[in-house]
Amino acid sequence: MSFLFGGPPKMSSAEKIAAAETEVEMVSDMFNRLTESCQKKCIPNDYREGDLNKGESVCLDRCVSKFFEVNIKVSEKMQGEAAQKQGAPGFGM
């Protein structure tokens, strides 16, 4: 009943595990999308060297930076919209 006094309801162990598993899946998905997208953009299919050259390395660095920048902006936008919905008059009443 802590939700009556402003605190969030307690999560059971099973709920905590499910939430952690969901978070791991989301992070894994984001990593896979990042890897696929930046590799496709920056690394040619015909490898000529064992290591990344300077151009490939710079491209990957910029790609990863942009990917996370966009991810942060999208997350902030979604959190703002969720907060507006929760604070909307008459919501849930």
Curated annotation (Swiss-Prot):
GO molecular function ontology, one term from the record: protein transporter activity
Paired cysteines (S-S): 38-63, 42-59
Domain of life: Eukaryota
Record keywords: Chaperone, Disulfide bond, Membrane, Metal-binding, Mitochondrion, Mitochondrion inner membrane, Protein transport, Translocation, Transport, Zinc
Membrane topology (UniProt): Peripheral membrane protein
Ranges in a coiled coil: none
Pfam entry (one): zf-Tim10_DDP
Keyword Mitochondrion among record annotations: yes
Keyword Lyase in record: no
Example GO biological process: protein insertion into mitochondrial inner membrane
One GO cellular component term noted in the UniProt record for this chain: TIM22 mitochondrial import inner membrane insertion complex
Localisation: Mitochondrion inner membrane
InterPro entries reported in the protein's UniProt record: Tim10-like (IPR004217), Tim10-like_dom_sf (IPR035427)
Locus of motif Twin CX3C motif: 38-63
UniProt free text on domains: The twin CX3C motif contains 4 conserved Cys residues that form 2 disulfide bonds in the mitochondrial intermembrane space. However, during the transit of TIM10 from cytoplasm into mitochondrion, the Cys residues probably coordinate zinc, thereby preventing folding and allowing its transfer across mitochondrial outer membrane.
Function: Mitochondrial intermembrane chaperone that participates in the import and insertion of multi-pass transmembrane proteins into the mitochondrial inner membrane. Also required for the transfer of beta-barrel precursors from the TOM complex to the sorting and assembly machinery (SAM complex) of the outer membrane. Acts as a chaperone-like protein that protects the hydrophobic precursors from aggregation and guide them through the mitochondrial intermembrane space.
Quaternary data: Heterohexamer; composed of 3 copies of TIM9 and 3 copies of TIM10, named soluble 70 kDa complex. Associates directly with the TIM22 complex, whose core is composed of TIM22 and TIM54. Interacts with the transmembrane regions of multi-pass transmembrane proteins in transit.
Family statement: Belongs to the small Tim family.
Name this protein carries in UniProt: Mitochondrial import inner membrane translocase subunit tim10
Organism annotation: Aspergillus fumigatus (strain ATCC MYA-4609 / CBS 101355 / FGSC A1100 / Af293) (Neosartorya fumigata)
Lineage: Eukaryota, Fungi, Dikarya, Ascomycota, Pezizomycotina
Gene assigned in the entry: tim10
